[in-house]
Regions:
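Positively charged n-region of N-terminal signal peptides that target proteins for export
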Residues: 1-6
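Hydrophobic membrane-insertion alpha-helices, especially the h-region
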Residues: 8-23
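Solvent-exposed loop/turn segments at secondary-structure junctions
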Residues: 15, 83-84, 102-103, 117-120, ...
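Surface-exposed, glycine-biased beta-strand/turn segments
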Residues: 23, 27-123, 155, 164, ...
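Zn2+-dependent peptidoglycan hydrolase active-site motif and core
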Residues: 107-148, 172-174
Length: 207
């Protein structure tokens, strides 16, 4: 298990522990009443985030994922899983090509774990999903307005826009989409389905 997996495992276990404490005792830490309003708000916010992570960790992983890039169908994706990359790396994800600025949505329900930048991915978003899986959206041209860590998301939630940030400069605009489980990266292509909105999916289920 690599360092990133260890960190996410720790977050999951901490979330489960916090959630279990509330379930068993029926209340949060009694010391919260002695905090200042700001401290109490921060404690409440942290608890809410841990609760979201805990509930997601207890759920079975999603068997199907909604296409994250608007206007792209699954059959348009050229399989790039495992392709050789610089430094002898294997490609641990799928590149989904589209025009710069094309909207990128969450492929699943979950909670935003990170909104930031790194050298390889450029502007990236991590979403924590059911079963503790992490969904990685990289090379974004920009983030969705007001998107922040801790936000609950659905397949209707805009995360950002297709771009070429990070080590994708000089390539056609695309989204690098990765999926990570406890054992490491898994190929997202077999899980992807053509995009439908969460509202439409709910209507189909309720028929």
């Amino acid at each position: 298990m690599n360092r990133v997996s260890h960190i996410f495992l720790y977050v999951s276990l901490a979330a489960l522990a916090s959630f279990a404490a509330i379930v068993l005792t029926g209340k949060a830490d009694s010391r919260a009443g002695n905090e200042t309003p700001t401290e109490a708000q921060e404690t409440s916010g942290a608890f809410n985030r841990y609760s979201k992570f805990a509930l997601l960790s207890l759920q079975a992983p999603d068997e199907k994922l909604s296409m994250p890039v608007k206007g792209v169908s699954r059959r348009q994706i050229a399989d790039t899983w495992g392709a050789e990359r610089s430094g002898g790396r294997g490609h641990r994800g799928q590149d989904i090509f589209a025009k710069r600025g094309t909207p990128v949505y969450s492929a699943t329900e979950g909670v935003v774990l990170r909104v930031g930048e790194n050298d390889l991915g450029g502007k990236v978003v991590f979403v924590y999903g059911a079963g503790g899986r992490r969904y990685y959206y990289a090379h974004l041209d920009d983030f969705a307005p007001e998107l922040k860590e801790g936000d609950a998301v659905t397949t209707d939630t805009l995360l950002g826009y297709v771009g070429t940030t990070g080590n994708a400069r000089g390539t056609p605009p695309h989204l690098h989409f990765g999926v990570y489980a406890a054992g490491g990266a898994i190929d997202p292509l077999p899980l992807l389905t053509d995009r439908i909105s969460a509202k439409t999916a709910k209507a189909i289920i309720e028929r």
